[in-house]
Regions:
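HhH-family (HhH-GPD) DNA N-glycosylase catalytic core used in base-excision repair
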Residues: 1-288
Length: 288
């Protein structure tokens, strides 16, 4: 049971542990900034300081109204992970991830920001992804300030579509520059991102894959981290290796891997992927 306490512009969340590193530094989100004074995140046009204290998460500055309308759904505080982790304990492999991944949760991120961020993520590393995103935000976002922190909002489809491919290349986007430009223009011109909430997983994936720069893996990331379609199972070389080494399953295609995961983990396939992925990244290998 999540417990929320308000103290001016500071909010304390307890009752179910939320670990800053496990949530914001696990590959689902790219605007997390460790800081000597206090770590902070930027989502859409908002900056939030985040701090773990004992078994709680403290966040600030936020009004109660902003928290309830934006940060509460962003952090998916309506969802408990206790039952999910109980299910994972029944799996011989997943049960090893639960203690390490305690405090993780899937975020509900802005649809357009997630779309562009994961187009940038293709064949890329996290350090470079973050650098490209910040460059694009500086080029097309709005300059803002919270306390002493200056930052840029994530561009809207309208402002991002105003950047030329040459300008996107200057931001470090590389071969992804035309994908970003064309997709931003498509959304600006009416490509519907909201209808995805009402689609089945398969239909939503096909819909996203009509956009330039969106293949099956990128689509699954968007569906999982923005639309909370938890059956989405992003597949890369790490995930294929996990399935082969620990589940004795060697998929010939990404689609085979997704179907295996849905059969194995059901509606929690995407959450299972994040637990496995985070565990391998932090522990190097699962102890058999």
């Amino acid at each position: 049971m999540i417990d929320i306490k308000y103290n001016g512009d500071r909010i304390t969340i307890s009752g179910e542990y939320i670990d800053i590193k496990a949530v914001f530094d696990c590959g689902q989100f790219f605007r997390y900034f460790p800081d000597d004074e206090c770590d902070y995140i930027i989502a859409r046009d908002k900056l939030l300081f985040v701090k773990n204290t004992d078994e709680a998460l403290e966040i600030y500055p936020s009004s109660r109204e902003e928290f309830e309308s934006f940060w509460y759904p962003f952090l998916r505080l309506d969802m408990s992970y206790l039952d999910t982790e109980t299910e994972f304990l029944r799996d011989d492999v997943l049960k090893k991830t639960v203690p390490v991944c305690r405090g993780m949760r899937i975020l509900h991120q802005d649809e357009f920001e997630t779309l562009i961020s994961f187009i940038i993520s293709a064949n890329n590393n996290i350090k470079r992804i973050k650098k490209i995103i910040e460059s694009i935000c500086a080029a097309a976002g709005k300059k803002r300030q919270v306390g002493k922190k200056l930052y840029y909002s994530f561009p809207t489809p309208q402002t991002l579509s105003s950047l030329t491919e040459a300008q996107l290349l200057e931001c470090g986007a590389g071969y992804r520059a035309p994908y970003i430009a064309k997709t931003a223009n498509a959304v600006k011109d009416g490509f519907d991102l909201n209808c995805i909430y009402d689609m089945s997983y398969d239909s939503a994936k096909k819909h996203l894959c009509t956009l330039m720069g969106v293949g099956p893996k990128v689509a699954d990331c968007i569906l999982l981290f923005s639309y909370n379609k938890f059956e989405a199972f992003p597949v890369d070389t790490w995930v294929k290796k996990i399935l082969k080494d620990y589940y004795a399953f060697e998929p010939k295609t990404n689609d085979e891997a997704v179907r295996f995961a849905i059969e194995k983990f059901g509606g929690n396939a995407g959450i299972a992927q994040q637990y496995l992925f985070h565990y391998i990244r932090t522990q190097s290998s699962l102890q058999k």
